[in-house]
């Protein structure tokens, strides 16, 4: 494929060092470009975060692309083979911070819109873009705030494509049609500090917690289902003691996380953890944080359309999957009937020398255009 506009726009976006939550006028660039084909722009800024809602049309169905202009820090610049914010083409790849996550996706959808509108100026429904500069950071003032605004005025989305990098081995081989929930716990087990030679005068929180820890790690939280693997429980950090070898610690701190399927609930998991701790007589404080509920788009119109567009452009059949971490899809699902994630390779995201394959760029744009055509132009491409 010889289309080069997607590559040029991706390079222009990558050249802007938009480390979260700094947008560096990436959204302004998108708004100026899309204004030329009839998109209205609404800036929705909260704190240091810039968000923009771009829409062409007023009717349903609404097909929305969701993405983020912010990127993670580069890490040691000297370890990059080329400056991270100077996009470089070599070895059949485009290098730069944000190349995979996710400035190429944004560029590809914008150019897909340009071609689609040129062919179908009177298309059905509406096209929208929800872009934030706070996805890689705390994600408190980004997509979640925009969703609140849209929800308050009953502005809903029929079909949403989140441009997260999803490809494993080749472009189009995987579509994310859901994500697991993420529930974290910060547990403080209370004991009584004392001299290690006089254990009868102390209470060792490591020892009192050990039986509960064994049960927590061996518990079957659920069996998963057709779309999700079983819920997992993992300890991420555990710390106790003063560093001295002759002191029984007074408390133990344990940080853990659930990645949970739709077979479990936040409330249910909390109740079961408390029950296990209480069963073993553990004295504790426990603080919870849920960063996202599980969501699922069952196989249907959007997944079918995306698979058809991938088959046409890439010649492969896409697999549906719910693996991986959380994304802003967890917020958008509250106002979106159907939602998927579809983008380039995820092999180098957040890494030194992040990159995408050059020949994947026009293909990804063609896939996005194919989705628009099938949803808003009666399958005409």
Swiss-Prot record:
Q: Which residues form the active site?
A: 70, 135 (proton acceptor)
The record's annotation in Pfam families points to:
M20_dimer, Peptidase_M20
- Reaction equation(s) it catalyzes: N-succinyl-(2S,6S)-2,6-diaminopimelate + H2O = (2S,6S)-2,6-diaminopimelate + succinate
According to its UniProt record, this protein's enzyme class is: hydrolase
- Annotated Zn(2+) 1 binding lies at 68, 101, 164
The cofactor named in the record is: Zn(2+); Co(2+)
Where along the chain is Zn(2+) 2 bound? Answer: 101, 136, 350
Note accompanying the cofactor annotation: Binds 2 Zn(2+) or Co(2+) ions per subunit.
Assigned EC number: 3.5.1.18
Q: Per the record's keyword annotation, is Metal-binding included, yes or no? A: yes
For this UniProt record, the keywords arranged alphabetically read as follows: Amino-acid biosynthesis, Cobalt, Diaminopimelate biosynthesis, Hydrolase, Lysine biosynthesis, Metal-binding, Zinc
The UniProt record lists the keyword Nucleotidyltransferase: no
Q: Which GO terms describe its biological process?
A: diaminopimelate biosynthetic process; L-arginine biosynthetic process; lysine biosynthetic process via diaminopimelate
Pathway membership, UniProt: Amino-acid biosynthesis; L-lysine biosynthesis via DAP pathway; LL-2,6-diaminopimelate from (S)-tetrahydrodipicolinate (succinylase route): step 3/3
Q: Which GO terms describe its molecular function?
A: acetylornithine deacetylase activity; cobalt ion binding; succinyl-diaminopimelate desuccinylase activity; zinc ion binding
Q: How does it assemble?
A: Homodimer.
The entry's family comment says: Belongs to the peptidase M20A family. DapE subfamily.
Matching NCBIfam families, A to Z? dapE_proteo, PRK13009.1
Q: What does this protein do?
A: Catalyzes the hydrolysis of N-succinyl-L,L-diaminopimelic acid (SDAP), forming succinate and LL-2,6-diaminopimelate (DAP), an intermediate involved in the bacterial biosynthesis of lysine and meso-diaminopimelic acid, an essential component of bacterial cell walls.
Q: Which HAMAP family match?
A: DapE
Record protein name field: Succinyl-diaminopimelate desuccinylase
Native species: Neisseria meningitidis serogroup B (strain ATCC BAA-335 / MC58)
């Amino acid at each position: 494929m010889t289309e080069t506009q997607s590559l040029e726009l991706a390079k222009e976006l990558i050249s802007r060092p938009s480390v979260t939550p700094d947008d560096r006028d990436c959204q302004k660039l998108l708004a100026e470009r899309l204004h030329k084909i009839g998109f209205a722009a609404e800036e929705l800024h909260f704190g240091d975060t810039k968000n923009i809602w771009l829409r062409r049309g007023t009717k349903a169905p609404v097909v929305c692309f969701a993405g983020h202009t912010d990127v993670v820090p580069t890490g040691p610049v000297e370890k990059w083979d080329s400056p991270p914010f100077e996009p470089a083409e070599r070895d059949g790849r485009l290098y730069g911070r944000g190349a995979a996550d996710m400035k190429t996706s944004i560029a590809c959808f914008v150019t897909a819109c340009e071609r689609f509108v040129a062919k179908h100026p009177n298309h059905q429904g509406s096209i929208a873009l929800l872009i934030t500069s706070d996805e890689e950071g705390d994600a408190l003032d980004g997509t979640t705030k925009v969703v609140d605004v849209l929800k308050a005025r009953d502005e809903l989305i029929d079909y949403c494509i989140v441009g997260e990098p999803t490809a494993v081995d080749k472009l189009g081989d995987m579509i994310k049609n859901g994500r697991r929930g993420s529930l974290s716990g910060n547990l403080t087990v209370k004991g009584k500090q004392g001299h290690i030679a006089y254990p009868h005068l102390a209470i060792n929180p490591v020892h009192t917690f050990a039986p509960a820890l064994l049960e927590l790690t061996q518990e079957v939280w659920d069996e998963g289902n057709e779309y999700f693997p079983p819920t997992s429980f993992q300890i991420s950090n555990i710390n106790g003691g003063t560093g001295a070898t002759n002191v029984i610690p007074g408390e133990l701190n344990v940080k853990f996380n659930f990645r949970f399927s739709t077979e479990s609930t936040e409330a249910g998991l909390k109740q079961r953890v408390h029950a296990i701790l209480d069963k073993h007589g553990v004295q504790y404080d426990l603080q919870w944080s849920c960063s996202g509920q599980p969501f699922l788009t069952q196989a249907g119109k959007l997944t079918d359309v995306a698979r058809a567009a991938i088959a046409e452009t890439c010649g492969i059949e896409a697999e549906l999957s719910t693996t991986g971490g959380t994304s802003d899809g967890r917020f958008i699902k509250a106002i979106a009937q159907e939602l998927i994630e579809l983008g380039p390779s995820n092999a180098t995201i957040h890494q030194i020398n992040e990159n995408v394959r050059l020949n994947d760029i026009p293909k990804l744009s063609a896939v996005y255009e194919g989705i628009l055509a099938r949803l808003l132009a009666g399958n005409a491409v």
